[in-house]
Amino acid sequence: MIKNGPYLALDTSYQKLSVDELLETAGKRLPEHFDDYRQQLCRGEYRNISEDRPVTHVLSRSVHAVAKQSNRKTRFVDTVQKLRSGRRLGSTGKPITDVVNIGVGGSDLGPQMGAFALREFANDAALHNLQVHFVSSMDGGQLYAVLPIVDPETTLFIISSKSFGTVDTFANVDTVRKWIEPELTQEQWLENHVIGVSANAQGMTDYGIPPAQQFTFGDGVGGRFSLWSALGLSIALTTGIRPFERMLEGAKAMDEHFLDAPLNENLPVLLALYGVYNREQLGINNLAILPYDGRLRMLPNYLQQLDMESNGKQYTAENEAIDYPTGPIIWGGFGPNGQHAFFQHLHQGYDQFTADFVTVLKREAPGFSDATRSGLAEQQRLAVANCLAHRRLMSDGSENADSPSDHYPGGHPSNLLIMDELTPESFGALIAAYEHKVFTQGVIWGLNSFDQPGVEKGKKIAMDVLRVLDGESDESFDESTDAVIQRMR
């Protein structure tokens, strides 16, 4: 049961229902106005009700949209080209050699995943060797690793924050400012070593970032949907402009497929409906993401945010409590490494799960000798063979009446997402397919998939605790929290 979409195929053979059976059951859960909803989404007219703003990330797929949202196309392109060619100079006249993207959540996971997956598509190896780094952790742990290997005079920092007020991000930025002080003035740093990417232009201006160093995107682009926007700058810096545009083209092709393909051929809709059936009818509360290509090793973390932040909710878009299961727990890891870690539990443990396997059938290896290319091709076949074998064993199981340790119960439903090759287009199509899957499940469950009040509530409580740690408050919480605070003092 392989269904073909743009740059991507989906095999649902190991699900519990055929596609026709699925449409007769879970398909009836699609709301009456589903066609209108997906049209609205792709036109930028769907509403994020709780935050009273449109949902516009799909509009970012246009090759020219990122540049338009960043005020002028030439400025986005020029910034990328100058940095990648070594023509962008720091305040002391030395070329910029390192870029550090400081962000968290959607300002980190998507850009970092895209840069890692597509870095081999940079077709200008002779140009300046620009290194792109990512910093997100609020504890400063990543700064410990990055700051010793970069030079203040040759490093540019991208401050990526939709609100331009994210506490995690600015904790890192404040430490960087302290690190910079012995080498550069604050004016030098802001004018020549900082780029801001945000939906809040005024916030960037108030911080002191010159307008020429600001890249904006629309307020209707949610953080977890933002790698297509100006927040994808670090991807473009890694790959160059053309591979970044190709990624947008692949996503746009999946948008059109989502709008136009019949339901029984529609990859995002089928992913959504199988997920709904497995959650509601089979009672399975988790989905493992298992990519079998090392370039996609960051996919599980990205999809964890995309899905769980969107649909991990107990209330409808109208803020009414619900009493049925919604989005599953998303987890997983790089498949070949998982085989030597958690696959034992998947094969012979008691817990039920569903899985999305992701495989790439072929991989080009330009720049290597014939012998090396042959070896790499053999390794790709090895990865595909293992993907197919473990998926089959998880589904069909294996019995040995004489040895309980050789019994594999099977019965675990799974999808297989297939790319003939991992290209910028197929990568863009893959991510867009999952976005539309999450959207479809959200409308089935009556959710607003574009807010995240749980995240905001946690931030507020954290600030209350921080004030106590800083001696600005004597508020008491609970026995455990108070004991840790006292121990830290």
UniProtKB/Swiss-Prot annotation:
<dbReference type="GO" id="GO:0097367">
    <property type="term" value="F:carbohydrate derivative binding"/>
</dbReference>
<feature type="active site">
    <location>
        <position position="340"/>
    </location>
</feature>
<dbReference type="Pfam" id="PF00342">
    <property type="entry name" value="PGI"/>
</dbReference>
<comment type="similarity">
    <text>Belongs to the GPI family.</text>
</comment>
<dbReference type="GO" id="GO:0006096">
    <property type="term" value="P:glycolytic process"/>
</dbReference>
<feature type="active site">
    <location>
        <position position="459"/>
    </location>
</feature>
<dbReference type="InterPro" id="IPR018189">
    <property type="entry name" value="Phosphoglucose_isomerase_CS"/>
</dbReference>
<dbReference type="InterPro" id="IPR001672">
    <property type="entry name" value="G6P_Isomerase"/>
</dbReference>
<comment type="pathway">
    <text>Carbohydrate degradation; glycolysis; D-glyceraldehyde 3-phosphate and glycerone phosphate from D-glucose: step 2/4.</text>
</comment>
<comment type="function">
    <text>Catalyzes the reversible isomerization of glucose-6-phosphate to fructose-6-phosphate.</text>
</comment>
<feature type="active site" description="Proton donor">
    <location>
        <position position="309"/>
    </location>
</feature>
<dbReference type="GO" id="GO:0051156">
    <property type="term" value="P:glucose 6-phosphate metabolic process"/>
</dbReference>
<dbReference type="GO" id="GO:0048029">
    <property type="term" value="F:monosaccharide binding"/>
</dbReference>
<dbReference type="GO" id="GO:0004347">
    <property type="term" value="F:glucose-6-phosphate isomerase activity"/>
</dbReference>
<dbReference type="InterPro" id="IPR023096">
    <property type="entry name" value="G6P_Isomerase_C"/>
</dbReference>
<dbReference type="GO" id="GO:0005829">
    <property type="term" value="C:cytosol"/>
</dbReference>
<dbReference type="InterPro" id="IPR035482">
    <property type="entry name" value="SIS_PGI_2"/>
</dbReference>
<keyword id="KW-0324">Glycolysis</keyword>
<dbReference type="GO" id="GO:0006094">
    <property type="term" value="P:gluconeogenesis"/>
</dbReference>
<keyword id="KW-0963">Cytoplasm</keyword>
<dbReference type="InterPro" id="IPR046348">
    <property type="entry name" value="SIS_dom_sf"/>
</dbReference>
<comment type="pathway">
    <text>Carbohydrate biosynthesis; gluconeogenesis.</text>
</comment>
<dbReference type="InterPro" id="IPR035476">
    <property type="entry name" value="SIS_PGI_1"/>
</dbReference>
<keyword id="KW-0413">Isomerase</keyword>
<keyword id="KW-0312">Gluconeogenesis</keyword>
<protein>
    <recommendedName>
        <fullName>Glucose-6-phosphate isomerase</fullName>
        <ecNumber>5.3.1.9</ecNumber>
    </recommendedName>
</protein>
